[in-house]
């Protein structure tokens, strides 16, 4: 039985809950752009049966190059996410990279996200668990789905059972990822809601030399397959102009693509239930 739990004040994720949508730009570029993207997505999903959580990173600590844009940092980034909450009434999620970030982040964020590259870091997982907030752990590209039992065990050791797991592809040779759709069933059998990160799954890590490439045209295909497989949520990086995005533009969706794919996912989910 998949665990079902609450997010924020009036939202559930898991068995029987509406489709969870985690969406937003890869990184906080500035306050104006962040609020614009959040408001656009909110408008798109207004009449859809989805639970929308806005996502943007205050720091992209694992960019390919030292010259890559990382974001505004913890303090300024959390302030901007706080404005998304207060002005638009949206729950928010962002990455935490070290135990010392968990305290201030948990004062603003509705969900703490553990990056894929850090999914085995015990101190980070237990700190996130001790916050009492829901924890979204992204499965590392190098981790088997069954190994997430040990990852979730670290969070569970704190008494926090509000855990979700996100599939974002597995390393397939150099500079490429592939999605094993068995992973959704395997991780759901661990007892936790499963989310599919469809945009990072088409990423080509380091594929452009000093930054990552990707191909957003495959996102709808993979997302539809994941909906048929019974995922509890989907994760999309979305931008008003992906080709000018400061991070992960090649794999980010346009607003028009998001508006097109969501009704398809809801129809597939209904048919498969």
UniProtKB/Swiss-Prot annotation:
Name the Gene3D superfamilies for this protein. Aldolase class I
UniProt-listed InterPro entries? Aldolase_TIM (IPR013785), DAHP1/KDSA (IPR006218), KDO8P_synthase (IPR006269)
GO cellular component, as recorded:
cytoplasm
Q: Report the subcellular localization.
A: Cytoplasm
Could you list this entry's UniProt keywords, alphabetically sorted: Cytoplasm, Lipopolysaccharide biosynthesis, Transferase
Q: What is its EC number?
A: 2.5.1.55
Q: Which GO terms describe its molecular function?
A: 3-deoxy-8-phosphooctulonate synthase activity
User: Which Pfam families did the record assign?
Assistant: DAHP_synth_1
Q: What is its main location?
A: cytoplasm
HAMAP family on file: KDO8P_synth (MF_00056)
Q: By what name is this protein known?
A: 2-dehydro-3-deoxyphosphooctonate aldolase
Organism listed in the record: Desulfatibacillum aliphaticivorans
């Amino acid at each position: 039985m998949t665990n079902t739990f609450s997010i924020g004040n009036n939202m559930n994720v898991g068995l029987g809950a509406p489709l969870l949508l985690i969406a937003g730009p890869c990184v906080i570029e500035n306050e104006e752009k962040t609020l614009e993207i959040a408001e656009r997505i909110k408008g798109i999903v207004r009449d859809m049966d989805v639970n929308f959580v806005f996502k943007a990173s205050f720091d992209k600590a694992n960019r390919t190059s030292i010259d890559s844009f990382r974001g505004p940092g913890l303090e300024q980034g959390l302030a901007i996410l706080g404005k998304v909450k207060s002005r638009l009434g949206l729950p928010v999620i962002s990455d935490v990279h070290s135990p010392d970030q968990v305290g201030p982040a948990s004062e603003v964020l509705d969900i703490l996200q553990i990056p894929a590259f850090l999914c085995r870091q015990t101190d980070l997982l237990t700190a996130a668990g001790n916050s009492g907030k829901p924890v979204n752990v992204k499965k590392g590209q190098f981790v088997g789905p069954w190994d997430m039992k040990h990852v979730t065990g670290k969070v569970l050791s704190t008494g926090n059972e509000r855990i979700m797991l996100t599939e974002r592809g597995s390393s397939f040779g150099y500079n490429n990822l592939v999605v094993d759709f068995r992973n959704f069933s395997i991780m759901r059998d661990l007892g936790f809601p499963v989310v599919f990160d469809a945009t990072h799954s088409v990423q080509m890590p380091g594929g452009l030399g000093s930054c990552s490439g990707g191909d957003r045209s495959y996102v709808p295909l993979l997302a539809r397959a994941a909906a048929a497989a019974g995922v509890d949520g989907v994760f999309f990086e979305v931008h008003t102009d992906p080709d000018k995005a400061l991070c992960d533009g090649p794999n980010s969706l346009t607003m028009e693509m998001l508006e097109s794919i969501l009704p398809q996912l809801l129809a597939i989910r209904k048919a498969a239930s």
